[in-house]
Every structure is written in C-alpha cells, then in structure tokens.
C-alpha cells in the first residue's frame, strides 16, 4: 500500500487534483506513516512542519487514509479543518474506513482531532499519513545546472576524444551563451563539419 502512495500514478493524480507540479513523495515517512491513537488520545489543532530538513524539500500536500472498520460516531476522533484565522471550523471528517482526506500544507492549514477519543478499550483510531513535497528552484543558487559531462578515457581513439571535447565545449557554451546565439553557433559548426 505504501508503495502505491509513492508511485508515479499517485503523484500524477495529486498533481492533477492540486495543480502543484513536480510532487515528490517522502521515502522516509518523516512524521508520516502508520498512526494509531487509543482511548483518551487526541491531536491538538496545529499547522504542520513545512520543510523536510533531511531531504531539504518543501512540504505541500497531506494525504490521510483512515483504516477504521466499524467506527461509531460516539467514538469521536473527527479530523477538524479550521480556517486560516482559527475563528471557525470549516469541516469535520469522521475517520471511516477507506476515507481519504487530501489538503494543502501551508503556514495556516490548521487541523487535528482535539477531543479525547471515547473508544472502548482496545479500539484504536488508525490512519496512514503521507506527505508530498516539491523541490525549490533555489537549489540553482547552490549547485550550477549542468548536463552530463563527458570525458574520453586515456587511450580512446581520436574520434572518441574529439566527440568528448565537443560535448564539453557545448556544455560550456550552454552555460554562457544565450539560446538564440547558441543556435547560430551550432548552425555554423554544422556547416564547418561538411
């Protein structure tokens, strides 16, 4: 099940639903995974962490799937979703089996199940929590964007060495020459090779 939630079809579904492109699942389930709460347990209203410090990713989406067979209303445990100003509860979601809740993670996406569970002993509120992230374009400030860098091995024939030099030269051109001018340079190179 966890594999499915981290799969490409799931990521594409979430991207289509949320219009957030480039979603990345968390293979480590930091803060996520299988959650279980017993009688008297609760989770106060809160806004989640937004940076995965291990992977340096921006958290964007929460997905919660409930695993509670025969859940009764008197048990409580409803997920509450609050407005940005914490003035009004916008939605209350019972944790029924196979119910899936998907919502954005931002600085004021307040949620939780703040009332103590009233379950019989041995009855647990169970869920799977999954978080989805995006990478930041700020990485380009720290790491230059280059494509694969080719080198010939010592002893490679002249054609292989020439090809590797040309590929490296093209890489340097892409870093420093505007795209319109680069097309012109490549056109000249093609003519010279004839």
Locations of the language-model features?
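Short acidic (Asp/Glu) patches
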Residues: 17-19, 44-51
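Catalytic core of Fe(II)/2-oxoglutarate
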Residues: 40, 50-59, 69-194
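A structural signal for short, well-ordered beta-strand segments
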Residues: 32-34, 63-65, 128-132
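Short N-terminal signal/transit or membrane-insertion segments
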Residues: 1-4, 61-64, 72
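Acidic, glycine-rich loop-and-strand cores that form catalytic or ligand-binding grooves
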Residues: 22-26, 32, 36, 59, ...
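Active-site-proximal inter-transmembrane loops
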Residues: 38-44
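Signature of the catalytic double-stranded beta-helix
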Residues: 1-30
């Amino acid at each position: 099940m966890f594999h499915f939630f981290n799969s490409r079809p799931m990521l594409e579904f979430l991207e289509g639903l949320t219009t957030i492109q480039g979603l990345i699942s968390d293979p480590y389930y930091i803060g996520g995974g299988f959650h279980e709460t017993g009688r008297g347990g609760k989770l106060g209203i809160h806004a989640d962490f937004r940076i995965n410090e291990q992977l340096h990713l921006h958290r964007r989406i929460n997905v919660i799937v409930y695993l509670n067979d025969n859940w009764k209303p008197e048990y409580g445990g409803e997920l509450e979703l609050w407005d940005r100003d914490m003035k009004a509860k916008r939605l209350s979601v019972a944790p029924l089996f196979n119910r899936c809740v998907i919502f954005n993670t931002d600085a004021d996406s307040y949620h939780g199940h703040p009332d103590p569970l009233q379950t019989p002993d041995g009855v647990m509120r169970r869920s799977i929590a999954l978080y989805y992230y995006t990478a930041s374009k700020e990485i380009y400030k720290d790491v230059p964007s280059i494509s694969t860098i080719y080198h010939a091995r010592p002893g490679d024939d002249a054609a292989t060495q020439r090809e590797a030099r040309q590929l490296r030269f093209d890489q340097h051109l892409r870093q420093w020459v505007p795209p319109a001018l680069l097309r012109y340079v490549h056109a000249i190179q093609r003519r010279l090779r004839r």
